[in-house]
């Protein structure tokens, strides 16, 4: 999604949005980065890009990520986070009940587990810890939580709802 240029585009139905693993927010470059962009662009030279990894390396890394261990307690934690987005009152989050029209689907749980594995891999661990789940939860869930009219009217965001959930759900 490009939040600036939306003319001629249509919002995807919820079921199609749910098929995207992540919704990553990319901000503008910093002032220093933008000055570098200007400088390099005006110089007319394209930066030389040298590969740091091969296609075979990527395939191999994917196999390693699939082997990153997720304990049953972490699976329970992931399921609890997603269930709390559907049934907030069961998790002591009754204040969220009227703010959410729909919560994460089973696909949200699957993708939160997969993304947590990838995050653990990036952190050079062969196992997932709760901090991995918490670190990636916003990217996995922000597009999977439907906001009610009340939430929109009071400027409550999915980011805030996800933060409330991960701060309340018991960590194993």
PLM region spans:
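Short alpha-helical scaffolding segments that buttress acidic/His motifs in well-ordered protein cores
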Residues: 37-38, 78, 82, 136-141
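Residues that form generic nucleotide/phosphate-binding pockets
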Residues: 37, 61-64, 81, 164-168
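Alpha-helix N-cap and coil->helix boundary residues
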Residues: 12, 33, 53, 69, ...
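Canonical AAA+ ATPase core
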Residues: 1-68, 117-119
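Conserved AAA+ ATPase small/helical "lid" subdomain
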Residues: 48-112
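C-terminal engagement/docking regions of AAA+ P-loop ATPases
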Residues: 87-172
């Amino acid at each position: 999604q490009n939040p600036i240029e939306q003319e001629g585009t249509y919002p995807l139905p919820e079921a199609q949005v749910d098929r995207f693993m992540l919704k990553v927010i990319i901000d503008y470059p910093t002032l220093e980065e933008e000055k570098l962009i200007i400088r390099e662009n005006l110089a007319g030279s394209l930066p030389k890009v040298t590969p740091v990894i091969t296609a075979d390396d990527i395939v191999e890394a994917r196999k390693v990520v699939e082997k990153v261990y997720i304990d049953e307690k972490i699976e329970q934690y992931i399921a609890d986070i997603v269930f709390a987005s559907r049934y907030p009152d069961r998790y002591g989050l009754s204040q969220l009940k009227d703010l959410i029209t729909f919560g994460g689907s089973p696909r949200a749980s699957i993708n939160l587990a997969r993304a947590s594995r990838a995050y653990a891999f990036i952190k050079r661990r062969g196992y997932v810890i709760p901090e991995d789940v918490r670190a990636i939860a916003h990217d996995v869930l922000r597009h999977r939580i439907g906001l009610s009219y009340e939430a929109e009217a009071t400027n409550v965001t999915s980011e805030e709802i996800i933060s409330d959930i991960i701060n309340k759900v018991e960590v194993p």
